[in-house]
Each structure stands twice: as structure tokens, then as C-alpha cells.
Amino acid sequence: MNSQIKTKAVYWGTGRRKTSVARVRLIPGNGLITINGRSGDDYLNFNPLHLNSVKAPLQTLGLENSYDILVNVFGGGLTGQADAIKQGAARALCELSPDNRKPLKTEGHLSRDPRAKERRKYGLKKARKAPQFSKR
């Protein structure tokens, strides 16, 4: 019997960081990044730190010019959104091929960063800042 490998045209991945959530689609292309309908450079204010973060999973596998990244992201600021996109792209690459999982995991692209804003407690001015202490 002839077994055929099914190949999809679109690979999905969801990433989260702080309060940001990114839905990432990988489409065979030439490395264009589109975030919320704008170019990746424009959306991330041409910040090389954020741009490199978004491209990191593809660069780890050497696929930066093989797939276009289409992103719908909301919540948080640019840093949180860039890291959410990174995680979403890494998850989409795992969907592309199970062999991609190991190198992405060793680079840390698949792990969710649990750091988030600590809540404010009553009796304090901020999460940990206490009012000035007076002995007398």
C-alpha cells in the first residue's frame, strides 16, 4: 500500500508572555513577518532586540527565509508581545515536524516564561513598597 505524507500549507502556534497572547501562522514563503496587518519591522519599532527575538526559532532551525510569519497579537507591551510571538512560532515549527522539538527546547523557545506583574497588597503602596516606617 502506498502511504502518502500529508503536508499542510499553514502551521499554527499560540504563544503567551506576561499579558500578551499571540496566534502565529507559518506559511511557506520567503521570511516576511506580518504582525496585526503591519510589517514586523514597523510594528516592533525597528527594535533589533524584539526583531531578533521573533526570528530566533526560525534561525535556530535555519529556516528564516523559508516561511512567512503571520501574527495576530494582543495585550501587553512590545517586549511581552515579541516573546509571545517567539513562543508561538516555536510551537508552530513543532507542528511542522516533531524533529524540530529537541533543538527548540534546548534553546528555550518552547518554555513559557512565568514572570508576571505581582499584585498590589493592601496596606502597601505597591506590590512590595511599604509606607515609611516611624519608630515614634
UniProtKB/Swiss-Prot annotation:
One of its GO terms (cellular component) is cytosolic small ribosomal subunit. One of its GO terms (molecular function) is RNA binding. GO terms for biological process: translation. InterPro entries: Ribosomal_Su5_D2-typ_SF (IPR020568), Ribosomal_uS9 (IPR000754), Ribosomal_uS9_bac/plastid (IPR023035), Ribosomal_uS9_CS (IPR020574), Ribsml_uS5_D2-typ_fold_subgr (IPR014721). Residues 97-136 are annotated as: Disordered. Residues 98-116 have a biased composition (Basic and acidic residues). Pfam families: Ribosomal_S9. PROSITE patterns: RIBOSOMAL_S9 (PS00360). Keywords: Ribonucleoprotein, Ribosomal protein. Gene3D superfamilies: 3.30.230.10. Residues 117-136 have a biased composition (Basic residues). HAMAP family: Ribosomal_uS9_B (MF_00532_B). Belongs to the universal ribosomal protein uS9 family. NCBIfam families: PRK00132.1. This is Small ribosomal subunit protein uS9. It comes from Prochlorococcus marinus (strain MIT 9215). The gene is rpsI.
